[in-house]
Amino acid sequence: IQKKLVDIKYFIYGSNKYLEKHGMPKTLVDLNKHKFISFGKGAPSPVYNPDWALKLGVKDGKKRKSIMKVNSVMGLLLAVEAGVGLAALPEYLVSNSNNVIKVLPNSEGPITEAHFVYPQSLKNTARITAFRNFLFSKIGDWKS
């Protein structure tokens, strides 16, 4: 059984500290003047194209260079919060951060669907029902 939980949206984010120092990009071309943090080659990614922000607004299929590569979404967030540069992050991850600002909010990245999947044989068990309710309550908290 598969139940869709949520669409996870990705945007480009930077810290207050970084954006005060380097300025807020106003156009896609402005991104070329900024430092980017990205996924390292071969690192497992939650999206099909983890480097989409490096290619956003760049012509001829080229991409910007990243100044730092990490192997997890949390690593990206920590580097952004530390003021290292800009990075593409899932919206839910930054929802509780007071230090991170969405850059170019109309430039949305890929959308990833998150699903709750379990075997048919566990459909009516208390354990699955409790966990499903927990997941939907947490998603409700994040969306509000």
Stretches with model-predicted labels:
Residues 123-137:
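Short amphipathic alpha-helical coupling segments at ligand-binding clamshell hinges
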Residues 77, 118, 132:
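A cross-family signal for key residues in well-ordered alpha-helices
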Residues 1-114, 140-144:
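C-terminal regulatory
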Residues 114-124:
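A bilobed periplasmic-binding-protein/Venus flytrap-type ligand-binding module shared by bacterial periplasmic
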